[in-house]
């Protein structure tokens, strides 16, 4: 798995016949030059087809490096692996265009990945849902539902990757009336990381320490919260197509004007405001869903953002100050024995398993697709 944060490739080995406990993991960071190219491909540019094809090859090589190294460390031959679920790197996500079927693009040369690993590769999971007029995202709520199936009470899961998405898992006692809900809430780490790198040279704000030194700029926060996406009802999905560095700078200019002499918040204050944006939009989504559905008893946070201590503290504080959400037990997936950075990679192992079995893996109540569909294509080794 390589997500919107574009920090690298997360590989995880999972025996889905014996529950969901991961056996091993390995991470390969993206080389800076590849990350630069992938970020540029999020917006139109010259010679895109050629650049995209070469980038897809490089992504496949990094995936293969992660898989082969993980298996070597475990002493496991490729023949032991039933399938490799590979997401690829999203560079465009436009699931609906003027009411017509849109597209979603995850760069990955799956044939090359198959060749380099000797393992069957399941990939391109989002396209089938988009073809069925769905959003193609988020796909993880269906996996979250399987992962937390043993919990009788209603569970909410926030996945803080580059983008934040919410999974709402009602109690199983509802039977046929039970409907899993999920949608993208807005930016999680994507803007925080971009601003941090731009102003400190660091790829991310470790533990939110830099943001914690700043003050929330409420006029800027109001400007950011006015983004129409936050007020759209689900099903909905988003990504770097909307929330990128250019969007943030446009919001700053709209709030403070183009004149550099106009007083602006410090870079640290902007970081604090972006952290508040993530916490607020996440909780706004949880609150709205609480009013539409059976109230959740637990709020589980996963993804890289769950490692941001300051952000987690702010999320908990906002919950405690909200009468509708004060009862929520807020925790990270690590407190449930599942590493926060492993959940999404595990989801694509599960999606690969569903593809090999020929079983449906989307949740139409989440994506808005016309019905349940078998997701992904398969390259045989």
Give the positions of each predicted feature.
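Phosphate-binding/catalytic loop of phosphoryl-transfer enzymes
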Residues: 96-104, 111-115, 119-203, 374
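Conserved ATP-utilizing enzyme core subdomain
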Residues: 4, 8-31, 178-279, 283, ...
